[in-house]
């Protein structure tokens, strides 16, 4: 075994070779030394366990191939672009909404230049970073003011911490949600230092339940969008409009966590109807929070709109600074919101809406092209068909609703397993992510952003 250890080259010997010099030129001295040390440590462990040299130390050429491979892998960006063929348009694990061209350009511009982020060009003095977007949001929603934080969970936390610390928040039992990542409304309330008061039952809550729970220690009445589930059957709930009327009568504010945050009526495009922010503001809700990267179709942000005096208190809370957005996010959000000033062009300009409204005819054309390319690359190893599919919006938006779609399905017909093909898909330069269902791989075209790029990627198979 000692002889095997002696066959291992030193780091210095590796670096002094011509190949070592080339590696240093390409990747830098520090990175090359670190990988060499890592490789030698692993080789010693391998010798102790197997009483032989690892393959990559059988000769110098193999050693340098291994070092080069590891250095390349180390330099690869780990957050990679993928082809979304899951049929879930707003897929949380795949980054949710695609940014519009306008948002991308706005973000790139502020990355490269100094900008008037907190500077009033008219007055020549400091301003607030939310001002530009606040004016735009007020115009779009009818609210008096707005506040921007880094996601909707942060928006809920800020509202609770500002108005309900040490006080009671009344909420229906049927709205005590948990979404992905074990985010629970009761946990957020606990973190904010407020007391949860549950009213009604899981399936039925009435206005009298809220009324009877109000005390002098009530901070506000809260409604929460049910997000990723739906209670059906023998149910009853109280609308924001009814709750707002009760709030005015009892002098208690009403707050809504709307979640998805639609700014337009989706039913005009034949999609499932979702409550809009404008509707909640018009119904008299004091504060409405929602996400920027769901139905809004933009950047990850938490947006709060509502009454000016309450928004001013949110802006003044110490948590606001900890939760604020940077210039890139704010620029992307502003550019996205400006698209809504011309709603007739939204299906062309906003990727999320474009994907959701693609006609089935176009999806079938894309499916035929995808099927042909797969058949040419997979050489009859699988049964490849075009089938009707059911896509979904995703990210908690209309969880029970489905959108007609078209998919290319792949089933086994030889001894080559689907699991092996799925693994190959994920090893491509731009991995292909579909879904497994009924013993087939489903590649749903509804959620695909670029058919040409996908076809080019498949040439790597």
From Swiss-Prot:
Its cofactor is pyridoxal 5'-phosphate. It catalyses: L-seryl-tRNA(Sec) + selenophosphate + H(+) = L-selenocysteinyl-tRNA(Sec) + phosphate. One of its GO terms (molecular function) is L-seryl-tRNA(Sec) selenium transferase activity. Its main location: cytoplasm. It holds the Pfam family SelA. Transmembrane segments: none annotated. It comes from the Bacteria. It is found in: Cytoplasm. Its EC number is 2.9.1.1. The modification N6-(pyridoxal phosphate)lysine is found at residue 294. One of its GO terms (cellular component) is cytoplasm. Belongs to the SelA family. Converts seryl-tRNA(Sec) to selenocysteinyl-tRNA(Sec) required for selenoprotein biosynthesis. This is L-seryl-tRNA(Sec) selenium transferase. It comes from Haemophilus influenzae (strain PittEE). The gene is selA.
